[in-house]
Swiss-Prot record:
It comes from the Eukaryota. Gene3D superfamilies: Glucose-6-phosphate isomerase like protein, domain 1, Helix hairpin bin. It is found in: Plastid, Organellar chromatophore. Belongs to the universal ribosomal protein uS2 family. CDD domains: RPS2. The lineage of its organism: Eukaryota, Sar, Rhizaria, Cercozoa, Imbricatea. One of its GO terms (cellular component) is cytosolic small ribosomal subunit. This is Small ribosomal subunit protein uS2c. The gene is rps2.
Length: 239
């Protein structure tokens, strides 16, 4: 059974690309046509790619790979946190800090600092500090939670990064390429498929489209790790 149906993708608006003047010619093989100055994504190609991405992600999860979900645009932020949490993956959904992967030693120290501050808050240690010092510590805690809260359980670099909006997350893409970390990417018509390993051509701006794709990838991770079939009963064997 298909991982996602054409009807589901149509309903989610996954077929709407960007204005034709903003396209990347490398995406031509995934484009069906142009209407009223907007490219329409070929959902048959999307379905094929989604099936491939599901199998690839499921296989990676089955072999014990660690995943990181990345998407900082407003319409993706909540979905990123929700679906990453559902499959036990780490996530970045507010801002990509430079060196988040390539300077992991420093980033790991900041995550440890976040955990220390949370322990201090939980024990009441911060509340017992002088008012000004407590305020400074709480501001630091709030900032670290905002940007690094989704990484608290990530002890090592991820093996796979799942990305929403390649153009916005350029720094994340470059860091992954530098470290040879495979990228599973939603690709709108202005993206470059050469900069990812597992492409999923679709609308990366619509919340429902993002939700549809990420929920399926989260299902794939859960199935790979726990052998749990999702609600669609996908039981395709590995290609």
């Amino acid at each position: 059974m298909a991982v996602v149906t054409l009807a589901e993708m149509m309903e989610a608006g996954a077929h709407f690309g960007h204005q034709t003047r903003r396209w990347n010619p490398k995406m031509s093989r995934y484009i069906y046509c142009a209407r009223n100055g907007v490219h329409i994504i070929d959902l048959v190609q999307t379905a094929i790619c989604m099936n491939n991405a599901y199998k690839w992600t499921r296989s990676a999860a089955r072999s014990g790979k660690r995943f990181l979900f990345v998407g900082t645009k407003k319409q993706a932020s909540e979905v990123i946190a929700q679906e990453a949490a559902r499959c036990g993956a780490a996530y970045v959904n507010q801002r990509w800090l430079g060196g988040m992967l390539t300077n992991w030693t420093t980033m790991r120290a900041r995550i440890d600092r976040l955990k220390d501050l949370e322990r201090m808050e939980g024990s009441g240690s911060i509340a017992m500090r002088p008012k000004k010092e407590a305020a400074v510590l709480r501001r630091e805690l709030d900032r670290l939670r905002k940007y690094l809260g989704g990484l608290k359980n990530m002890r090592r670099l991820p093996d796979v990064v799942i990305l929403v909006d390649q153009r916005r997350e350029t720094n994340a893409v470059l860091e992954c390429r530098k470290l040879d970390i495979p990228l599973v990417s939603m690709l709108d018509t202005n993206c470059d498929p050469d900069l990812c390993d597992v492409p999923i051509p679709c609308n990366d701006d619509a919340v429902r489209s993002v939700q549809l794709v990420l929920s399926r990838l989260s299902d794939a991770i859960n199935e790979g790790r726990h052998g749990v079939q999702d609600q669609r009963g996908n039981d395709d064997s590995e290609g």
